[in-house]
A protein has these predicted regions:
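Glycine-rich beta-strand-turn "strand-cap" elements at beta-sheet edges
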Residues: 2, 41-46, 76-99
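N-terminal first-folded block
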Residues: 2-40
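Short, well-ordered beta-strand segments in beta-rich or mixed alpha/beta enzyme
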Residues: 2-9, 39-66
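Serine/threonine-rich low-complexity intrinsically disordered regions
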Residues: 11-14, 58, 94
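Short, structured helix-loop boundary elements
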Residues: 15, 19, 49, 68-71
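An amphipathic, aromatic/His-enriched active-site/gating alpha helix that lines ligand/cofactor pockets
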Residues: 24-36, 55-89
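Intrinsically disordered, low-complexity acidic/polar segments
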Residues: 15-17, 61, 97-99
């Protein structure tokens, strides 16, 4: 399994627009085969900072995701909304255990 975690930043005055674009992206991505988890969370103490968490079954699922129409639309939205400070990392993980 692959875990992607990190954050992106948008200017606080564009958060509402970003929320709309993110909602479309999240809904479409969660329907993809191989997507185990896909979530964005706004930082409550740092306006404009959006934390991202993704879990993918395997590299093939992630590659299919990167080629989707909604990923292309998200890239355009990120550019148009001037997202910056993109800081994401990918990790190979096992299935974990309950805490």
């Amino acid at each position: 399994m692959l875990l992607i975690a990190g954050a992106i930043r948008v200017s606080p005055e564009k958060v509402a627009e970003a929320r709309e674009a993110a909602a479309r992206m999240i809904a479409a991505t969660r329907a993809e085969d191989g997507c185990e988890q896909y979530a964005f969370a706004e930082d409550v103490l740092d306006p404009g900072l959006i934390h991202i968490s993704e879990v993918w079954r395997d590299q093939a699922a992630l590659e299919r995701h990167r080629a989707t129409e909604h990923m292309g639309a998200w890239r355009i939205a990120m550019r148009d909304l001037a997202f910056h400070e993109r800081n994401l990392k990918i990790y190979e993980v096992d299935e974990g255990r309950r805490l």
